[in-house]
Structure formats: C-alpha cells, structure tokens
Regions:
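Extended low-complexity intrinsically disordered regions
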Residues: 2-44
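Structural motif
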Residues: 18-21, 77-82, 122
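Generic structural signal for hydrophobic core residues of well-folded globular domains
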Residues: 32, 93-94, 134, 138
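Structured beta-strand/loop patches that form or line metal/cofactor-binding pockets in enzymes
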Residues: 41-64
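Short connector loops at helix/strand junctions that flank enzyme active sites
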Residues: 53-57, 67-71, 84-86
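Conserved interaction-surface patches within small, structured recognition/assembly domains
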Residues: 63-81, 91-95
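Alpha-helical support elements that line or immediately flank enzyme active sites
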Residues: 86-100
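C-terminal binding/interaction regions
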Residues: 100, 105, 109-143
Length: 143
C-alpha cells in the first residue's frame, strides 16, 4: 500500500487519477495556470536554488514560519507549462504543512499522478528533483 499523503495533496492526486488519461495533461496545464505568484520579497533576488534537473528554469526557496509551517516559493517562466504545473501541484498540495509532513512525502510521489505515459521521463525526473530539493531544504531549515 502507498504511504498516505497530506489531504490536499491526496485530493490533487485523486483528481489526476480519476481523470481520463487523455485529459490528465489538461489538468496539469490547469495547475500551470494556477502557478503561485512570486512573493514581492523574492522579486529580483538571485539566491533561490535552481533545480538543475528540470528541462526549463525552475527556482526554489522554502521558509519556515513562526508556527512551524513550511512555505514554498517557486519561480519558472510562463513558457514552461509542464514545469510550472509540477511546481504548482507541490505548492497547492503542501504549502503550509509542517516540516515533518513535507519531509515524510514519499519519493515515488511523481509516479502517483498517472502521467508516466504522457510526459517524458526527463520531465518526471525534474518533478522528482523538485520534490527532493524541497525535502532537503526543509530538513536544513529545521536542523
């Protein structure tokens, strides 16, 4: 049995899995359109970590608030809808969760969306790398 996911993230996975295969890319594009706006405090900054494994430029930072909740900051060009879609999924699925919850996310998460036949292995590897970077940054925040 698969490891359980936080409720919002599970809901996103279910949306993909419940959609017919030929509509899953449309769902991914919907998430790309819902890509979070870069917070004003990050505009022009150059200290976001680049996720090199992504085919398109993707930059990442994580923050821990006073209540111990993690906030994810991502930036990617509008011309990179797949990359933006994957980053948006993580943002909408886990932003505001505890560090413990995020670090416990399963490494196989990118395979749970039913996209294996629809996007290239390189794109899925980028999603895996993004997840790995988020988890590593969060571990560093709480160390």
């Amino acid at each position: 049995m698969s490891e359980p996911l936080p409720p919002r993230l599970q809901e996103i996975v279910d949306t993909f899995v419940d959609a017919p295969a030929d509509l899953r890319l449309d769902v991914l594009l919907d998430y790309a359109k819902a890509f979070p706006k870069l917070p004003e405090a990050y505009v022009g900054r150059t200290d976001l970590e680049r996720v090199e494994e992504c085919q398109s430029p993707l930059f990442l930072a994580t923050e821990l608030d006073a209540e111990g909740r993690v906030h994810i900051v991502v930036d990617a060009p509008v011309e990179a809808p797949t990359t933006r879609g994957f980053a948006s999924i993580l943002f909408h699925g886990v932003d505001g969760e505890t560090a413990e919850t995020i670090v416990a996310l399963p490494d196989d998460l990118p395979t749970r969306f039913g996209l294996m036949e629809l996007v290239s292995p390189l794109r899925l590897r980028g999603f895996s790398a993004l997840l790995g970077r988020v988890k590593r940054q969060v571990r560093e925040l709480v160390a």
